[in-house]
Amino acid sequence: MKKIAVVGTGYVGLVTGTCFAETGNQVVCVDIDSKKVEKMRNGEVPIYEPHLDILFERNLKANRLSFTTNLEEGIKDAEIIFLALPTPPGEDGSADLRYILGVADDLGKLLTSYKVIVDKSTVPVGTAEKVHAAIAKHASVDFDVVSNPEFLREGFAVDDFMKPDRVVLGTSSERAEKIMEQLYKPFVRQGNPIVFMDEKSAELTKYAANAFLATKITFMNEIANFCELVGADVDKVRIGIGSDDRIGKRFLFPGIGYGGSCFPKDVQALVNSGLENQFSFEILKSVMSVNESQKTVLFPKIENFFRGNLKGKRIALWGLSFKPDTDDIREAPALYMIKALTGAGANVVAYDPEAMENVKAVIGDQITYAENEYAALKDADALLICTEWGIFRNPDFDRVKSLMKDAVIFDGRNLFEITEMNKKGFYYTSIGRKTCEK
């Protein structure tokens, strides 16, 4: 059993703290938001993540998981302190380290014995050195700084943490290495590796992984757009190239772009990190540009269908989160489509299983929010699908057709088979495939 402090209870911090408590560790989570801390003390999970609530409740009741706003109190008995703080993009797109370095500065004044400080946030290369320097400025005791990037997928974060395909640990300290290896042993019993490396390599590993996945998605979106021009079928192309082990089947599904808290921010931050070191990531610059335009790639199709006049048209929209199984709407393609549609005079009626409250907080009553997916369809001139939630994959098409004013679907996630849509009498257009005319 280790005594652990987690500073920051956002998405990464709360999953990290809860999962470490689940393996028998004593965890104190620290956050400056007193209202949030009070809610968590009372058993309220502030984010939506499948299965997190079960682990949270169990460990809160077992007193293995606790919360405080007091940093000194939170770290007092901890052997290991995780920093899970936001690194928002600055004005130039580079990662803003003020929260991490601010806490590091405070820690330097508070340390009374040896501790391992672990950077769990996604940070530019060289951040561990800056954290070490900020702590060392005030500290009178030994400490080590470790880079331990997270590789959690929203919607699968608990499973990803409990059964990681690898654990990356960046440290030059044998003492810290042994402590961290012992901490993570219960999570890699099936033989997946704990990969030790230097701090800078660990920091870059996280950025490189996200940038590669963003590039793979964007490449496939460009192939899909080209398929439409030449009459090829992106589904066939996807299967053809994905069967090659060197390429693999994952992250080859075309759509209306990536969003979320990681890919957009991390690709931009890596590009900026390159510029700071007189290096230009030309591929990643293109990835950002293509993804930005991909988010509204369906809008011209919608506009053309309605002959340039969307004023007063009622558009049902399924899916607001940037991906299924999360309530995260950061950089969600749906928001870009809403802006384009409402800007053209359309009335949008949206439904999402988890993200509607978050969207309300951002855009308020610019759109109408439906009670369920079918309620959104009433008298709709068209349906737009932006997120591939499971409940949208197999709807009652007869009911869909009866509710809508016209049987028209614009599918940004390629959920349905063209032949089936043709049989059912829908006008159906998607990404990288031929349009099904009624």
Give names to the regions the model predicted.
Residues 1-438:
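Structural/interface elements that position substrates and couple domains in central-metabolism enzymes
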